Amino acid sequence: MRKVSVLVLALAAVAVALLAATAQAKPKSAKVTTVTLSGWTAGADEDNLLQQVVNTFMKSHPSIKVDYSVINGDYTTAMTARFAAHNSPDVFYVDSSLASTWAKQGVLEPLGSYIKKSKYSTARFYPSLLNTFKVGGQIYGFPKDWSPLAMEINTTMLSQAGQKAPKTWAQLQSVAQAMATKGVVSGGKPICLSADWARMLPFIYQNGGTLANVQSPAATAAVNFYVGLINKGLADTPDKLASDWCGKALGSGKAAIAFEGNWLLPYMKSTYPDTRYGVFPMIKNKAGGNLAFTVSYSMARDSRNKQAAWTLLSWLTGPVGQKLWVSKGLALPSRSDVKAIGGRQAFLIAAPFARGWGFPNFSNTYTVMNNDLTAVITSGKPVSQMLADVSAALKG
């Protein structure tokens, strides 16, 4: 009986050991952290592409699930409401025009400690783009992409006028005059110019003007040149060219010259595939001047998943994520170690000097800018009064 008991105990011990070994061999299920990611929509192509990029991230980071959703409607209003309710996404788009305001409101997480801890290098970002998201010496986001303006010209009309692509203000006016004289733009104007400071401000920079001294002779002369092209009959606004923006005016043949960003290229390909046009560097005068329209991925100050959010944010803006993002040509890389697809050189050469699109009291100031510019163009409001109004708005 004693032998039987010993045998039973021995078998039991073996069974326990086997169970323990099996339990140890069985991998524990890793904890999965869900990170929310949001931005505005720029069309189905861009939304679908971002989802593909996110899917690639999740495959290489199985412990992080990314819940990507598009915020429809007015993005700024929607995000402001979410900030107030403390339920903003973990990672989200921040337009350069809003970066300073949101950082000062304390709704964006400063990234300095994450950069230091992970030894993340920011050296490959174009400095002018990265600096757009620096406030008080702190980085509040990494630029996910960008676009400056370039000059797009209907090459058929340019050839019919016997002209070459202009490089300077004087040449621009000369080419436009030749187009007008020869009537190559039937039912339209040689140049499309929007009543929008997002198109006129580069001309101020090109003439040595600044927003800090927006009432200077240099700024005044730049505005007079811009508006003067319209007054001389060489240009007009999109609404006068049966268009809602200059891209449509160019594509439909109502204008031969436009000043738009990289976003024009996929639009022309899908909407006006038969229009022959070329993309040339932005016009210049005393100097090169351009705007950098850029958007960051930033982290919510209230995020409950900050480490996982940082992992996503830094990957999306790193070389692997950004290479995937710009692969379709919908945007330009904000990193010098990621190549843009072909045909973008006219945009990329603006990287060293393009200035971030944004300024103090952005929402109110931008409204004043464009309302006054419209009044200057349509009802003869004095340029000096517009610049005085803008100066006051900038100061708050």
Cite the ranges covered by each PLM segment:
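Extracytoplasmic "Venus flytrap"
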Residues: 29-52, 147, 198, 356-362
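Short, low-complexity disordered leader/linker segments with a strong preference
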Residues: 1-36, 59, 336-338, 385-388, ...
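Extracytoplasmic "Venus flytrap"/periplasmic binding protein-like
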Residues: 52-125, 156-167, 257, 267-271
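Glycine-centered hinge/linker elements that transmit conformational signals in sensory
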Residues: 176-180, 212-239
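C-terminal lobe and pocket-closing loops
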Residues: 29-31, 116, 261-274, 283-372, ...
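Extracytoplasmic/periplasmic substrate-binding proteins
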Residues: 40, 58, 199, 224-305
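Short, well-ordered beta-strand elements
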Residues: 30-43, 64-69, 90-91, 140, ...
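Hinge/lid segment of periplasmic solute-binding proteins
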Residues: 96-150, 173, 274, 279, ...
